[in-house]
């Protein structure tokens, strides 16, 4: 159950908070680069 919840949580975040998801993606991309 924990694995399923952990997998679904980000999906809900991207659906309900697309702006936040974009910011997170930009931050991760900058961190990697």
Curated annotation (Swiss-Prot):
Disulfide bonds: none annotated. Processed by the macrocyclase-peptidase enzyme POPB to yield a toxic cyclic octapeptide. POPB first removes 10 residues from the N-terminus. Conformational trapping of the remaining peptide forces the enzyme to release this intermediate rather than proceed to macrocyclization. The enzyme rebinds the remaining peptide in a different conformation and catalyzes macrocyclization of the N-terminal 8 residues. InterPro entries: Amanitin/phalloidin. Probable toxin that belongs to the MSDIN-like toxin family responsible for a large number of food poisoning cases and deaths. GO terms for molecular function: toxin activity. There is a cross-link at residues 11-18 (Cyclopeptide (Ile-Pro)). Belongs to the MSDIN fungal toxin family. This is MSDIN-like toxin proprotein 5. The keyword Nucleotide-binding does not apply. Residues 1-10, 19-32 form a propeptide.
């Amino acid at each position: 159950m924990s694995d399923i919840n952990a997998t679904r949580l980000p999906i809900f975040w991207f659906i309900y908070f697309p702006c936040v998801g974009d910011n997170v993606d930009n931050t991760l991309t900058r961190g990697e680069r």
